[in-house]
């Protein structure tokens, strides 16, 4: 089950109390104080685990507390430190206290101290003085710290697929990656984001994210709305997946409506580098003309992707991807326009190389 938002309570451990004791040995009637210090309370850490991509493990487990420190012992023995609490989260997890962002956990294997445990109390050996040889007092341990926090997950991927419901995003990600999403011929088959690793060759791979289909008004929460748009905020490149076979809504209108929703949600998201995939091209007549017209619509001075072996359909790349073009392309310009068919795997092999080249 995919979960991307939970509220939990975290607490560090209480420090252990110091010990009140006196040295007792044979022939020693009144030994001095030898009470040990209490152990410090356990700390709370967040640790980023690259092997998980959901917060589902937190469902039903609201309280996450470190252990208390052990009491001090006799003969100046210090108490054991309380066991730390390690809270494992997926990359891209943000920790909020109220509405304020507290921690942003991105790097795999990163471990961040969230709460420090309470300090252990001092034993009575610390309170011996010239005027008080037999102190009967020891400190209590300090209390730990408790916080109510909200965990929000924003998936981290290199490529983010954006499109209307039933555009073929899930079929595409299942064709070129190791992801196995549910696929069916009706809208909103995909109800949660899917992540897939795309292997290009023995040395190169990248991570692709497929989010549920966007509808008009998604930026205001319609459909699956804002709850999933946030998952493409961290992607490096967006790939608009357009259904070239739709008769009721042309590819230009699809693109314009999708971009409008992104701009309403986040201007920074709308300004990310992007490319366009014209899916279901195997059932469209004169797909080459459609692709050329769409390039003209985008003001894209493009060239055929002969280097990537695209057959039998044309593909178009921004010159930035096919040469040592030193100047970065305009952020509003498409990096590629590529007809393909996810179902029949037409041009999907070449797509891997195109996407790899598009990554900064």
From Swiss-Prot:
Its GO biological process annotations read:
ribosome biogenesis
Domain OBG-type G per the UniProt entry, residue ranges = 157-360
Chief location bin: cytoplasm
What Pfam families does this protein map onto?
A: GTP1_OBG, MMR_HSR1
Positions with a binding annotation for GTP: 163-170, 188-192, 210-213, 279-282, 341-343
| SS bond list | none
User: One GO MF term, please?
Assistant: GTPase activity
Name the cofactor(s).
Answer: Mg(2+)
Which CDD domains does its entry note? Obg
Task: Tell me a GO cellular component.
Answer: cytoplasm
The Obg domain covers 1-156
Sorted keywords for this record are: Cytoplasm, GTP-binding, Hydrolase, Magnesium, Metal-binding, Nucleotide-binding
Q: What is its EC number?
A: 3.6.5.-
**Superkingdom:** Bacteria
Q: Mind telling me which InterPro entries this protein's record contains?
A: G_OBG, GTP-bd, GTP-bd_Obg/CgtA, GTP1-OBG_CS, GTP1_OBG_dom, GTP1_OBG_dom_sf, OBG_GTPase, P-loop_NTPase
Entries under HAMAP family matching the protein: GTPase_Obg (MF_01454)
Family assignment?
A: Belongs to the TRAFAC class OBG-HflX-like GTPase superfamily. OBG GTPase family.
Query: What job does the chain carry out?
Result: An essential GTPase which binds GTP, GDP and possibly (p)ppGpp with moderate affinity, with high nucleotide exchange rates and a fairly low GTP hydrolysis rate. Plays a role in control of the cell cycle, stress response, ribosome biogenesis and in those bacteria that undergo differentiation, in morphogenesis control.
The protein depicted here goes by the name GTPase Obg
Question: What is the native source organism of this protein?
Answer: Helicobacter pylori (strain HPAG1)
The gene name on file is obg
